[in-house]
Amino acid sequence: MAAQGFLLIATFLLVLMVLARPLGSGLARLINDIPLPGTAGVERILFRLPGVSDHEMNWKQYLCAILGLNMLGLAVLFFMLLGQHYLPLNPQQLPGLSWDLALNTAVSFVTNTNWQSYSGETTLSYFSQMAGLTVQNFLSAASGIAVIFAFIRAFTRQSMSTLGNAWVDLLRITLWVLVPVALLIALFFIQQGAQQNFLPYQAVNTVEGAQQLLPMGPVASQEAIKMLGTNGGGFFNANSSHPFENPTALTNFVQMLAIFLIPTALCFAFGEVTGDRRQGRMLLWAMSVIFVICVGVVMWAEVQGNPHLLALGADSSINMEGKESRFGVLVSSLFAVVTTAASCGAVIAMHDSFTALGGMVPMWLMQIGEVVFGGVGSGLYGMMLFVLLAVFIAGLMIGRTPEYLGKKIDVREMKLTALAILVTPTLVLMGAALAMMTDAGRSAMLNPSPHGFSEVLYAVSSAANNNGSAFAGLSANSPFWNCLLAFCMFVGRFGVIIPVMAIAGSLVSKKSQPASSGTLPTHGPLFVGLLIGTVLLVGALTFIPALALGPVAEYLS
């Protein structure tokens, strides 16, 4: 079993790096504001039609463009879900959503979280899924990538005030990266057996003689961008464990690759754009070390079996509860870590049924800010915040003004970095405390034990860090939970983007200083260790007390 697990992890990472490298080169061209071959004419036409200016923006203008697009998308999706029953492509005549569920769902998909307090096949029409959720899957992913584009430019430009043009970046990211790659993935899913139709639900007779209603719909097209954009919201309630979404072991492997593809490619692009590929490799090493350790822990915990069943004398040599038999323990464990290391949230197994330690690792990966590969764009700018913090700590230890890539890190940047890092832990801890203090919060718990607290902590961690997965024992479709989680998702997304853009605006105006003998190397194993230590230290200090009340207490009981 250990050899199989090692081979699975090694194969996954090897294929990932091979695919991400060329994509990283393409992203580097876009960051450097170089149109891809044959696209310049199309771009000019698309900008001329709506009269959009392609002039460069400062950080405030860039931020306002991103926020404005997302707020418009939020309003459109909210009213679309409310009035779903008036819109076409609704063969099952599904009614509109309640205001609180519509708000939660709209915020969820606009913020790239894709938390779902509903069952897709019994709640949403084809039009809502396709014109509402799938569109936001593209736009939310493009928004995150655009922010990291601007942030990277802050290190490569000197004594400037502009970070690029948000509309140009959004157009190029969507048309030349997300749409083509998602199209290829969708066609592959269809070839493998994923659904793509607009038929009414089909009544069939099962082998037992009973009748069953099979849901239909345009699944493959949504599934592709759901994974590529680290969105994660499933067309069906069972998400990627449903055979209509994820029909074969090969589609499952491609789905895991798609989740990590753009976050990995962005690391390669970062190294290429800064002129020092070692910087990108440093980030990949730090992410990969944490990732491999976490996968190993989850695999070990799940292979041990369920201790409660073992205590009762039942056969539980491995923990198969909540897992698809066609995928098994090792693949389910790998997928769980992939989907929570990135801000995806898609699942092929129920995380609520993992062992105490097996479920704690995905929860902790979200709590440290989704920086281990992370979401498209958001993962890298989240990790870059920890890079700045690590550089600052190192500067304090050696008595020098901290600098990174030649840019001095001053008080303003550190205050904004601390603010951005503290946003999500504050939301998680205060949100969980509020839920446990109120009857409306506690009544949603399936279990009154430490595992019940873990369900609450997982839900708020998932929402605040824009992941979207859940310990599904929590009954979250209530006004209290829909509003609480919507607030956490909204602030967790834009409360980090705003200081990140402010940091970019500050750094882009500075001159780049040449490296000297006292400059801290930020590309070697020493800095990789320092960066990993910084991530672990912040995560440990912030969440160990809360984790001790949930999964740790469950493990020891």
UniProtKB/Swiss-Prot annotation:
It comes from the Bacteria. The system is composed of three essential subunits: KdpA, KdpB and KdpC. It comes from Shigella flexneri. One of its GO terms (cellular component) is plasma membrane. HAMAP family: KdpA. It is found in: Cell inner membrane. InterPro entries: KdpA. Part of the high-affinity ATP-driven potassium transport (or Kdp) system, which catalyzes the hydrolysis of ATP coupled with the electrogenic transport of potassium into the cytoplasm. This subunit binds the periplasmic potassium ions and delivers the ions to the membrane domain of KdpB through an intramembrane tunnel. Keywords: Cell inner membrane, Cell membrane, Ion transport, Membrane, Potassium, Potassium transport, Transmembrane, Transmembrane helix, Transport. This is Potassium-transporting ATPase potassium-binding subunit. The chain crosses the membrane at residues 5-25, 63-83, 132-152, 170-190, 253-273, 283-303, 329-349, 356-376, 379-399, 416-436, 484-504, 526-546. One of its GO terms (molecular function) is potassium ion binding. It is a multi-pass membrane protein. Belongs to the KdpA family.
